[in-house]
């Protein structure tokens, strides 16, 4: 009986060791993505310094932590004004404002409800844009679906602002602008995933994502107040139609910034 008990105990220990090793491997993989390893090591180093330096070490370590991890920012607010796309499908248009600079993110249309007879499309109410027309630095686009770019021909007839988007997104937009006879009046700027564009107080960073349409991007707005991440429509796809997977690593880096 004793031998049997010893055997069972040994087997249990071996099984536990295997489980622990597997768990550590999983945790390590997650940590590499999220940056937990780096944070844990920093915390361990701070704890060691605290133990050796006493109270003064605590003050220095905590002060250093605040300095390293808190982004520099101002007390001036960022104003975020959605003109469409909330609690509805379509009409995605969001305005970001900081002091005298404004940026438009996406400019989509919506299809009419069944009871809206005689209406072909619905676009956002752009009355507010007329109030800030001289402060709009540009329009940035996430992808080429109608609910994100469909209103642009109507908006660009009233505002002369540069437009930024990926090659496919602008290719689709060009056809629309040509139909409306304003293609030569609009300044279109082709960007690639990874590019950064300075627009007044904003720096728009374009990050590759996956969606049901190729060449989609998320947009990280770097501002004096902090970073605003607008993912756009996206999915995590291991076999994306444009061969490149969503840039999760960059999302993780932005989370640490």
Give the role of each language-model region:
Residues 1-72:
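Intrinsically disordered, low-complexity RNA-associated tracts
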Residues 66-140, 145-257:
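His/Asp/Glu-rich metal-coordinating catalytic cores
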